[in-house]
Amino acid sequence: MDYCNKKHTAEEYVKISDNNYVPFPEAFSDGGITWQLLHSSPETSSWTAIFNCPAGSSFASHIHAGPGEYFLTKGKMEVRGGEQEGGSTAYAPSYGFESSGALHGKTFFPVESQFYMTFLGPLNFIDDNGKVIASIGWAEAQGAWLATKNEAA
């Protein structure tokens, strides 16, 4: 039976300290956020990255087309305006789950922070009117990472 002879996807190991963080695209962030793409998976439409977020930095408004999970390893992250505006505030160390369709206005980091996140499906960045301006899935994340990594080399 041919379906049993599918090619096995190779395992991966990434030693984070062996790679340089590169700037996350400024069109989707503010304040100098850097990142490393750790894995992209066409077979599951997922991508995993680690982000360094300086104090005062933020991600632009976006919608999670698919669910995502994060682990805040350092700092503080205010989602949907933080607790003071009815959203969530994560304090390290913290785990979070983002459901499909979750709408986030600016995600803000009031102190130096770092988090690891796996996205299942694309992240849709939106303008002030809620119109999607960019959809970042595994292929786009991989392309941005490779382009920026090659520029930095």
Swiss-Prot record:
Name of one Pfam family that matches: Cupin_7
Gene3D superfamilies on file: Jelly Rolls
Catalytic activity of the protein: acetylacetone + O2 = methylglyoxal + acetate + H(+)
Cofactor(s) demanded: Fe cation
Cofactor binding note: Binds 1 Fe cation per subunit.
UniProt entry keywords in alphabetical sequence: Dioxygenase, Iron, Metal-binding, Oxidoreductase
Superkingdom: Bacteria
Pathway given in the UniProt record: Xenobiotic degradation; acetylacetone degradation
MF GO annotations: acetylacetone-cleaving enzyme activity; metal ion binding
InterPro entries: ChrR-like_cupin_dom, RmlC-like_jellyroll, RmlC_Cupin_sf
EC number: 1.13.11.50
Summary of subunit composition and partner proteins: Homotetramer.
Function per UniProt: Cleaves acetylacetone to equimolar amounts of methylglyoxal and acetate, consuming one equivalent of molecular oxygen.
Protein name: Acetylacetone-cleaving enzyme
Organism for this UniProt entry: Acinetobacter johnsonii
